[in-house]
């Protein structure tokens, strides 16, 4: 049974985050397509520390984030928050076998897993090549990837970690389903998701409205 603090976190946090983000930055959620039924993987770009809470708020229900282990052990409040949202730890520079097992188990239970394939914050999309982990999980579990593009978070809370005024959005893309198996399927799925992300975050499309 899900622990009380996990249930409480997901009951309260998404609404609170959406409210505060709308108040500060005119936060909007733009959907190109409806979410598929779980299980699935959310794969998002990573411009800012704001991205995980805004992505979680856009989904609005329980999910498990794959999170760098470096974030733990620095601030007790951050540790408590990450643990309340059941973050799956990945140690930098290692093969994340434990994280893979935990992610696959959660997907097998009908859950949603969120991965940031760049593996770290980047000043802009395309600066860091995405890693294949999200696509590998999708192919292995036989579930789709849903793209989420964070837009504007780098302008209001970027690499210098200073808050600024601006507009932020989360754009929700279509579901990308694995085709085939093995490395070819992983590469194909990574390519399709990356191409969508490049379009969603391109300056010519960033200002376009959503559904």
Language-model regions: role of each:
Residues 13, 73-77, 156-158, 165:
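Short, glycine/polar-rich helix-capping loops at beta-to-alpha or helix-loop-helix junctions
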Residues 36-94:
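Catalytic core of membrane glycerolipid acyltransferases/transacylases, capturing the structured
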Residues 9-10, 14-46:
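Helix-to-loop junction immediately C-terminal to a conserved catalytic motif
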Residues 19, 32-33, 55-57, 79-80, ...:
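Short secondary-structure boundary/capping segments
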Residues 22-24, 60, 79-84, 140, ...:
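Short, well-ordered coil/turn elements that cap or connect secondary structure elements
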Residues 24-28, 94-100:
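Glycine-rich, highly charged phosphate/nucleotide-binding loops
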Residues 16-17, 84-90, 117-121:
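Short, basic, glycine/proline-bearing loop/turn elements
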Residues 1-8, 98-211:
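Non-catalytic C-terminal accessory region of glycerolipid acyltransferases
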């Amino acid at each position: 049974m899900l622990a009380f603090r996990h249930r409480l976190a997901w009951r309260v946090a998404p609404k609170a985050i959406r409210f505060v983000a709308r108040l500060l930055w005119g936060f909007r959620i733009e959907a190109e397509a409806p979410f598929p039924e779980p299980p699935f993987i959310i794969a998002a770009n990573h411009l800012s520390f704001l991205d995980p809470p805004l992505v979680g708020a856009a989904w609005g229900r329980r999910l498990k984030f794959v999170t760098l282990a470096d974030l733990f052990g620095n601030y007790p409040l951050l540790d408590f928050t990450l643990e309340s949202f059941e973050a799956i730890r990945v140690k930098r520079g290692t093969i994340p076998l434990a994280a893979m097992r935990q992610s696959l188990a959660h997907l097998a239970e009908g859950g949603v897993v969120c991965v940031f394939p760049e593996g770290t914050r980047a000043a802009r999309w395309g600066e860091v090549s995405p890693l294949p982990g999200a696509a590998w999980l999708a192919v292995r579990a036989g579930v789709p990837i849903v793209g989420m593009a964070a837009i504007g978070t780098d302008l209001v809370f970027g690499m210098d970690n200073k808050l600024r005024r601006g507009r932020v959005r989360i754009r929700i893309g279509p579901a990308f389903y694995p085709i085939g198996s093995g490395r070819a399927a992983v590469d194909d799925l990574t390519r399709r998701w990356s191409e969508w992300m490049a379009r969603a975050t391109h300056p010519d499309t960033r200002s376009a409205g959503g559904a």
